[in-house]
Each structure stands twice: as structure tokens, then as C-alpha cells.
């Protein structure tokens, strides 16, 4: 539980490790170093959803939901790769200025 924590304290956090410590979530530092941006991006998306779905909950309830969201974001990358989740724009758009071998074969009529 995060009852002793305040929403003001939460808003001052910046690092993945700070969020994990704030919510008393056990974590592997090496895993976080490798997946930091993806965990934080997923966490950001999940807290946006919490704020949208539960706009009128107390700060304590909101922090509890945020704790669950961070746990979910952290656990997601234990079973999925960043490439599979495609959180960032670079993974969502097809690369530009690339000629695929299949396209060359089709054009050549081979």
C-alpha cells in the first residue's frame, strides 16, 4: 500500500527506480536498466488510462491504481520485448528509404 505516500511526492519522481521504490515494488536493477524507457512509457499510458477511467477517486486511491499500473508495466517487459509492444513511434511506422528484396523480385518478374 502507498497510504503514507502523497500525490505531491509522486509528482516529483523522475527515474524508473524512484517510482519503483516509491511504490515498494521489488525490481531487478539490470532489468530496469535495459527496459527503463519502455517501462516508463507503458506506465505513462496506463496512468493516463487510470486518470480517464477514474477521474474522481481520492489521491490515495489514485496512487494505489498507479502502483498496480507500474507493476503491470514492469511485468509486461518480463514476457514481451519492446519490439513486440511497439510503444514508440519508431516501431510503429515502416522504415523509409528501404527497398525490400521482395519488391525487387516482384518488379523483376522473377
UniProtKB/Swiss-Prot annotation:
This protein's name: Nitrogenase-stabilizing/protective protein NifW
Cross-referenced Pfam families: NifW
Its biological purpose: May protect the nitrogenase Fe-Mo protein from oxidative damage.
Keyword Cell cycle: no
Organism the protein comes from: Rippkaea orientalis (strain PCC 8801 / RF-1) (Cyanothece sp. (strain PCC 8801))
SUBUNIT field: Homotrimer; associates with NifD.
Entries under InterPro entries matching the protein: NifW (IPR004893)
GO process annotations (BP): nitrogen fixation
Keywords, in A-Z order: Nitrogen fixation
Family statement: Belongs to the NifW family.
Keyword Metal-binding among UniProt keywords: no
Listed HAMAP family: NifW
Superkingdom assignment: Bacteria
Amino acid at each position: 500500500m502507498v497510504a503514507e505516500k502523497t500525490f505531491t511526492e509522486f509528482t516529483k519522481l523522475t527515474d524508473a527506480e524512484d517510482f519503483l521504490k516509491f511504490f515498494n515494488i521489488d525490481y531487478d536493477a539490470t532489468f530496469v536498466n535495459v527496459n527503463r524507457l519502455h517501462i516508463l512509457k507503458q506506465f505513462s499510458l496506463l496512468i493516463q488510462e487510470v486518470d480517464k477511467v477514474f477521474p474522481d477517486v481520492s489521491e490515495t486511491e489514485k496512487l494505489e491504481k498507479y502502483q498496480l499500473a507500474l507493476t503491470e508495466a514492469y511485468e509486461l517487459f518480463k514476457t514481451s520485448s519492446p519490439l513486440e509492444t511497439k510503444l514508440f513511434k519508431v516501431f510503429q511506422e515502416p522504415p523509409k528509404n528501404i527497398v525490400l528484396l521482395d519488391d525487387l523480385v516482384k518488379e523483376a518478374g522473377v
